[in-house]
Design a protein with these regions (language model features):
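N-terminal domain-start signal
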Residues: 1-40, 47
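Elongated scaffolding segments in large macromolecular assemblies
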Residues: 102-181
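Short coil/turn segments at secondary-structure boundaries
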Residues: 2-3, 19-23, 37, 61-66, ...
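Short alpha-helix boundary/capping elements
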Residues: 11, 15-16, 29-30, 50-58, ...
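Compact, glycine/acidic-enriched structural inserts
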Residues: 68-99
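Amphipathic alpha-helical scaffolding segments
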Residues: 24-28, 66-76, 118-122, 136-142
Length: 181
């Protein structure tokens, strides 16, 4: 519980600013290997863990979902839109769609995390989980320009997929982006 509270307090803060979470979010390599700035991995893990802690909050049910299939942020936001249609015919008419689009259009990692934090807060209020391991991998890949479009496209595909698609296949279809140098 204390670790989760420390992680929550670090949401929106720079990697390394909260000593209580260093063992969770910092790489243990030499300064010569890692450099002065946070690594892509540190930024991705820090963001994913702190947003998970924010998302989990006081929810009794686990907000990290790895059951049956990976649930990207796009798929979780789709679930949020469909759970609160309020007379709308399409998920794209739900206000959360504009928030997802703002996150996808974010030009910097910092602005992406601000938009992601807003979406995660909404997911937490609705008790809709997402796969934070996948989210960390997506955030890592987003930071590599040659992989960014693939991550964004997958989030968009997962939002666009209808609940009927998921029911027919038994899972949402996800594409892994292979690691390459």
């Amino acid at each position: 519980m204390a670790a989760r509270a420390h992680l929550r307090s670090a949401a929106g803060r720079e990697v390394g600013d909260v000593p209580a979470i260093w063992s969770y979010t910092l790489d243990s390599g030499s300064e010569k290997e890692l450099g002065q700035k946070p690594t892509r991995g540190e930024r991705a893990v820090h963001t994913a863990l702190t947003l998970w802690a924010l998302h989990q909050g006081s929810n009794d049910a686990p907000m990290n979902s790895t059951w049956k299939h990976e649930r990207t942020i796009g798929a979780s936001v789709r679930r949020l839109a469909y759970s609160d249609m309020g007379g709308r015919e399409r998920a794209e008419e739900h206000p959360v769609y504009k928030r997802l689009c703002a996150m996808i259009a974010a030009p910097t990692f910092e602005s992406l995390t601000v938009h992601a934090r807003g979406l995660v807060t909404m997911l937490g209020s609705a008790e809709i989980p997402m796969d934070y391991g996948r989210f960390a991998a997506d955030l890592y890949n987003w930071q590599k320009p040659e992989r960014r479009a693939g991550v964004l496209r997958q989030w968009g595909r997962d939002f666009a997929r209808t609940p009927a698609d998921e029911e027919q296949t038994g899972s949402s279809i996800t594409t892994s982006i292979p690691e390459s140098n």
